[in-house]
């Protein structure tokens, strides 16, 4: 089978290659999926480029030679003891708790990583959902009282997580401020954002505005600056960002906002087929939609990874595997 393979860290055009590799076989409680589509996440980029976060799984060389966690496809075969799925079932899911390997014609998944695709949902849209959509959903759930009177800020709003979170927050009638580079202004306003801030022109922690909830995908501010931008009782949910910021929020977030009943913390992502299915059903019903920046064939996978690494993508970057 064909797969995008890499054996050392570096730029995608230098280390990523399309190769013929043996097709994996499903073991007990596993399913072999013929991959139709896969999405590219920042976590793929981090592992490919060998950023400090990306080297957590492999300090000196890549742990997973074939990246790709979010997939959609059709069950080709099932392993021993599998009763939840059978060949021919359309499925999707996040393989990041298992073997990865989604940037290939076939991938092995644990049954607990997959859900059936709802009727009316295509493979590209299904593969776009898992990590980005579930992160957005889990982040907003930290503030169950969100509603028409709520002020929300999304930092790094133009990527996969942010474009999902923006739609979900607007569905709850919240007032949503988004922060990203100016090139994404029109797309985010068209998606429903009430206010746009270009981070290259203004610092959202310095304008005096305060929010009930801040969801930050690219956190770079100190806990004190975050706290000043939250209302009394407000909450900060950090999904990603610079390692020093992540460490500061993890260590100090529980103390910094205590006087004003604020909560500052990191979101510990939990891959969830149930969350993925809920989001997929919303997409199939037309109340939510994955924003697709572009679709690349498997042979141009290096371009897809480079697009994510550039920071210019609006929404999800996708790889179409099955022709």
Segment roles from a protein language model:
Residues 22-40, 52-98, 217:
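Glycine-rich beta-strand-centered segment in the early N-terminal region that forms part
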Residues 205-213:
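A short acidic, Gly/Pro-enriched loop at the edge of an enzyme's catalytic core
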Residues 127-198:
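Mid-domain Rossmann-like dinucleotide-binding core that forms the NAD(H)/NADP(H) cofactor-binding site
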């Amino acid at each position: 089978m064909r797969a995008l393979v890499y054996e050392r860290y570096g730029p995608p055009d230098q280390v990523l290659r399309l190769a013929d590799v043996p097709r994996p076989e499903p073991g007990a409680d596993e399913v072999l999926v013929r991959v139709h589509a896969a999405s590219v996440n920042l976590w793929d980029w981090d592992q490919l480029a060998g950023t400090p976060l990306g080297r957590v799984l492999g300090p000196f060389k890549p742990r997973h030679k074939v990246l790709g966690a979010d997939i959609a496809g059709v069950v080709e075969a099932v392993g021993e003891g599998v009763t939840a799925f059978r060949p021919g079932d359309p499925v999707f899911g996040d393989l990041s708790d298992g073997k990865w390997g989604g940037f290939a014609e076939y991938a092995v998944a644990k049954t607990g990583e997959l859900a059936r695709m709802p009727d009316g949902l295509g493979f590209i849209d299904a593969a776009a959902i898992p990590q980005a959509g579930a992160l957005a959903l889990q982040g907003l759930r930290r503030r169950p009282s969100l509603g028409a009177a709520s002020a929300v800020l999304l930092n790094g709003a133009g990527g996969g997580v942010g474009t999902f979170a923006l739609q979900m927050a607007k569905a709850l009638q919240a007032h949503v401020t988004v922060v990203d580079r100016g090139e994404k202004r029109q797309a985010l306003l068209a998606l429903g954002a009430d206010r746009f801030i270009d981070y290259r022109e203004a610092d959202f922690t310095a304008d005096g505005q305060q929010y009930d909830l801040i969801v930050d995908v690219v956190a770079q501010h100190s806990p004190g600056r975050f706290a000043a931008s939250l209302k009394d009782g407000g909450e900060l949910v950090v999904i990603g960002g610079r390692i020093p910021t992540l460490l500061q929020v993890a260590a100090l977030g529980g103390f910094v906002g205590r006087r004003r009943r604020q909560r500052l913390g990191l979101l510990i992502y939990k891959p969830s087929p149930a969350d993925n299915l809920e989001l997929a059903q919303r997409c199939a019903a037309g109340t939510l939609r994955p924003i697709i920046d572009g679709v690349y064939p498997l042979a141009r996978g290096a371009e897809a990874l480079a697009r994510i690494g550039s920071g210019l993508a609006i929404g999800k970057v996708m790889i179409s595997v099955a022709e």
